[in-house]
Amino acid sequence: MFAGLQDLGVANGEDLKETLTNCTEPLKAIEQFQTENGVLLPSLQSALPFLDLHGTPRLEFHQSVFDELRDKLLERVSAIASEGKAEERYKKLEELLEKSFSLVKMPSLQPVVMCVMKHLPKVPEKKLKLVMADKELYRACAVEVKRQIWQDNQALFGDEVSPLLKQYIVEKENALFSPELSVLHNFFSPSPKTRRQGEVVQKLTRMVGRNVKLYDMVLQFLRTLFLRTRNVHYCTLRAELLMSLHDLDVGDICSVDPCHKFTWCLDACIRERFVDGKRARELQGFLDGVKKGQEQVLGDLSMILCDPFAINTLSLSTVRHLQELVGQEMLPRESPDLLLLLRLLALGQGAWDMIDSQVFKEPKMEVELVTRFLPTLMSFVVDDHTFNVDQKLPAEEKAPVTYPSTLPESFTKFLQEQRMACEVGLYYVLHITKQRNKNALLRLLPGLVETFGDLAFSDIFLHLLTGNLALLADEFALEDFCSSLFDGFLLTASPRKENVQRHVLRLLIHLHQRVAPSKLEALQKALEPTGQVEEGEGAHQVPGPVLGEAPSHVCVTPW
């Protein structure tokens, strides 16, 4: 432990042992050893007899002096690191490191050596290897030193990052299955800035620092994991990490990430939960500005747009825009703003396919989505307005009007075959549920049994739907409503999808008192586990080996 002292010409325990072994007068030898190796300052030496009279052990005295000197030395090292020209101060620190590194394994002096290394932008490679080879030293060194180790050792960096990524995914999935059922406090309620203060994002930000190479490694981990698991929460983390570095004004990274300004603009939209005309044009400008030969940037842009918070904002804006078009008596194809929202939505939803195929082209917009599906959706809005107006008429003027109960066959076909149509359709369902529009909900529920990629049974949609259904609490006392919701929709996926059962249970925990006892008993029986369960969509794990794979290159280009 004290071997390093000999290199500095300082006596240690072995020297004392040898002295006592060879001496003829041990007491004199001890006194001489104390004199030679004790505190040499006259002002302190004179205090020793006084302390002896008070029974203060010499060890306690020397330890106190040592601690004080070490603190002063740490302060001085930090001062050297911030004074004068860079070249001069780094030279001083390198000299100090050379003299002190032999003491790095001494617990009492280790903080000084670590402090010196922390302030060096480039620690000598030989010393980095010695630190990396010793687990105790590696754990003790500052993150500034670890960055220098990680940038040339992706496997080790992957080992550090992997638990954080697993933790992040678990936190997101736990939020989706939160026992709280509320329209005001749901998965999308926290603001972007609040989310970026989360433990995982802050730790990753600290680990990356201003190191472009490490930032690029994290992006490669996220892309690979997204490709392997299809878990969209990795897309969220990709955007949050970039904006966390933006908050800290880390220009070294933000200035070289081609997605920075696009993500910054989109972040403002997510904060407002709406894409206004001005920001829509800014986003369009970024997409149109992708030059020939730089199409790979679309890969990262699509991943950022695949973030559930971005999809949520774009979908809400689309539904709101459709309602405005009804009032303006305009068709979807006549609205450039709506077409841009659809373009962004299509790019986000096509992220996985783009990364998988490595074909970096914007997905082609289905013409029928704009010319047939969206007008049909607008006709549903008109049906609601017509029915509501009729209900408000005086009895003598009211015509016998019944609310439409069927869906056009083409509409359900769109939900089954086109992802874009399905996403917009599901957000329209969320909209009418939030408006407490029971008639419209019951009309649309049968169309949700079979949707593109079972999107109607995804955790995000069911999380939002169950929260909105809390507004219709009184309707759960009605047999027809419960049958349509549970038997006609939710239970059609049970027990095939375990996640659906969990969301149904979340709903019943809050509303079971409103449900008729006979119906509640039937639901309990239907929800009993059978042992034949698929993995929920939130069951994805972070594959360990992925983070240890060497990248094909290391630079801040999207791919």
Regions found by a protein language model. Give the residues of each.
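Very long, low-complexity or repeat-rich scaffold/adaptor subunits
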Residues: 1-559
